[in-house]
């Protein structure tokens, strides 16, 4: 018969091994004494399952920890952290996150201290697997209607982190009304956020149709329109074309503080020559306009070949 290891040593070691990612040794301790799955670590006052998912553990170890202590899936530490939420934040493997969901689907409806749902967290990480994201959405579709304490819905975060993917479109399909909701800090609509973070023309077009007024809305501090925000270093002609199509007058609008027109911004950021051409054609007089520091668009982009040409 296998003798149990020293219990005090086990209680100290299980969390240390998990933090050091010594998975095989942690598994051995768990097999020798499953009660270690109920011990509290000193670093985060957490159970071993929570400690493990912070460190990208293998699926087999997570399954063993859940089997030894099923309640650990729904147990928060003193900071309010739950294994599923922590696994998503730590970008654990798809298999590990899926195992946590299946062990306790109710956790999908949990909230963090900032008011974020699990779906909010899933929208924060570009590496999130689409099928897994869709599983979270199916378990709680109404999560798309919740906003965190900053006034951000999952759609805002999806536009921030997932513009090149289908996730932002999926969230928009689930709750298109969120396109008409601005955040509480900068009064940005999802259209502003998507424009700034490299959304393609198709997504911008869909956001516009869900709430056309967003294209004329200016952010609180700098007074940027979506077109200003789209004229960044990652701008694509398709995105700028869509924004100009629906609100060509935006090419004539300067920022509240710097007075820069979209052409100033695009020139400064070295945007594609096709983008510069579209902005010029929308407002030819922009070439002569100076911003608050006295620079014309040409002077803003003096270091970029595309502007010189």
For the regions a language model picked out, list residue spans one by one.
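Leucine-rich solenoid repeat scaffolds
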Residues: 280, 287-309
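Core solenoid repeat modules with strong leucine/isoleucine-rich periodicity
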Residues: 110, 121, 126, 130-132, ...
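A generic tandem-repeat structural signature
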Residues: 69-126
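N-terminal segments that cap or nucleate solenoid repeat domains
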Residues: 3-57, 61
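Start-of-repeat signature of ankyrin repeats
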Residues: 10, 44-46, 80, 115, ...
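Ankyrin repeat A-helix N-terminal signature
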Residues: 16-21, 51-58, 86-93, 121-129, ...
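Ankyrin repeat boundary/linker residues
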Residues: 40-43, 76-77, 111-113, 147-148, ...
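Ankyrin repeat domain, specifically the short helix-to-loop turn at the C-terminus of the second helix
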Residues: 28-36, 63-73, 98-107, 134-144, ...
């Amino acid at each position: 018969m296998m003798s149990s290891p020293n219990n005090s040593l086990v209680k100290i070691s299980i969390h240390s091994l998990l933090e050091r990612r010594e998975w095989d040794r942690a598994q051995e301790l768990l097999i020798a004494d499953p009660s270690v799955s109920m011990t509290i670590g000193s670093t985060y006052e957490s159970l071993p399952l929570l400690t493990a998912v912070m460190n990208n553990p293998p699926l087999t170890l997570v399954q063993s920890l859940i089997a030894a202590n099923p309640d650990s899936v729904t147990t928060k530490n003193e900071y309010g952290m739950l294994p599923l939420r922590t696994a998503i934040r730590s970008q654990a493997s798809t298999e590990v996150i899926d195992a946590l969901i299946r062990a306790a689907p109710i956790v999908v409806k949990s909230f963090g201290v900032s008011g974020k749902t699990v779906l909010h967290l899933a929208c924060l990480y570009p590496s999130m697997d689409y099928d897994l994201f869709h599983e979270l959405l199916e378990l709680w579709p109404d999560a798309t209607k919740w906003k965190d304490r900053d006034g951000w819905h999952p759609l805002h975060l999806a536009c921030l982190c997932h513009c090149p993917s289908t996730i932002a479109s999926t969230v928009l399909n689930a709750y298109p009304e969120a396109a008409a909701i601005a955040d509480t800090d900068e009064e940005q609509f999802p259209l502003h956020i998507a424009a700034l973070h490299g959304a393609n023309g198709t997504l911008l077009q869909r956001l516009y149709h869900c709430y056309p007024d967003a294209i004329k809305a200016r952010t609180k501090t700098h007074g940027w329109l979506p077109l200003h925000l789209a004229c960044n270093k990652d701008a694509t002609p398709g995105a700028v074309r869509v924004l100009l199509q629906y609100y060509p007058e935006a090419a004539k609008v300067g920022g509240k503080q710097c007075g820069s027109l979209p052409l100033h911004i695009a020139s400064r950021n070295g945007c594609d020559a096709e983008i510069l051409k579209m902005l010029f054609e929308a407002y030819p007089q922009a070439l002569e306009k100076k911003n608050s520091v006295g620079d014309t668009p040409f002077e803003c982009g003096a270091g970029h070949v595309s502007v010189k040409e």
